[in-house]
Amino acid sequence: MAIRVGILTSGGDCPGLNATLRGVAKALYHRMGDKVEIVGIMNGYDGLINGNFREMSPDEFSGILTVGGTILGTKRTPFKKMRVVEEDKVDKVAAMKKNYRAAKLDCLLCLGGNVTHKTANLLSQEGLNIIGLPKTIDNDIYGTDVTFGFHTAVDIATEVIDRIHTTAGSHSRVMCIEIMGNKAGWLTLYSGIAGGADIILLPELPYDIKKVAAAVENRAKAGKNFSILAVAEGAFSTEEAKMKRKEWTAKRAEAGYTTATARIAKQVEEMTGAETRICVPGHMQRGGSPSAYDRVLATQFGSYAAGLVADEHYGVTVAMVNRHVTANPLADIAGKTRGVPGDCDMLNVARAMGISLG
């Protein structure tokens, strides 16, 4: 009798999702042949709740190694609403368990970020056989040194910074580039260093706007006619750090600032007299073909997950720890975020290069 493996992709998309799906599938088919059946669950947990399943064939996993996005579709389904019965009267947790069993699944693989893993842990606690795979361009999943999608996003954000240099220099401007990362600054830190940013602002290190302005002025005094700021979308000031989140978000709204980057650009212009511009690459950082690094990582993670399925090792998520692929208990990582620590080597590199961290 064939083992039936469900698989879904949930949350925001990123490069490497399809490569990971392929890694799982090819390894399972190679190991088990016709003794495994893969069931695709469309649009993440929404598909699990509503029974939107698709029987997959081996051919559907061919030719997708280099393809961005996800062949299964994805959708954000907030964890905080999982146990909330809304107007549709659907008990989401009960529906997911019912549809899992109706499809006669032996296990379910959940590809996603922090919220996806919280729900994966919930389902594991509810008695389902769950395996997680860590996906996010933010690189902020606890317990793993790297997530697939991160390095491709670094490449994309770095190219943006590279290209901004020439226009910044030509027009003698201060360019503020908003990089994705609401709670963790890994993407901004790595792309900022790789792209030669002069100032890098992260959520983990509240910035002093006076120091930011001083860094711009010091470059001007040194004969540099432009400055590049790499700003994480979740960056906030030392003044805001003293307030509750609702308070400082309200103050930003009252002042007409939709983002931290807009506020910083305006303040720098007022304090230095330098002409400033904002660049927001946005969802470009999540799109397109995965890098060679992410293709390899996705294949590693996918093949390892297939081994976990074969060994019936559930209630875990795949991780890279000290360059070795392993598995962490879902209960140990769910609800935790891996931010840039204060003793991070890359912060020391930035400081050694004279990059201002605000």
Where are these regions (language model features)?
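Accessory alpha-helical/coil subdomains and C-terminal extensions
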Residues: 99, 110-112, 120-122, 150-171, ...
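Short, hydrophobic alpha-helical segments
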Residues: 165, 220, 306-313
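Short Gly/Thr/Asp-enriched flexible loops that form oxyanion-binding sites at enzyme active sites
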Residues: 20-24, 114-128, 188
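A cross-family phosphate/adenosyl-ligand binding-site feature
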Residues: 1-9, 20-104, 111, 115, ...
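Short, ordered loop/turn segments at secondary-structure junctions
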Residues: 10-13, 41-46, 76-77, 113-116, ...
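Short, acidic/small-residue loops that bind anionic groups at enzyme active sites
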Residues: 32-33, 123-147, 151-154, 201-208
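Short, glycine-rich nucleotide/cofactor-binding loops
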Residues: 8-18, 180
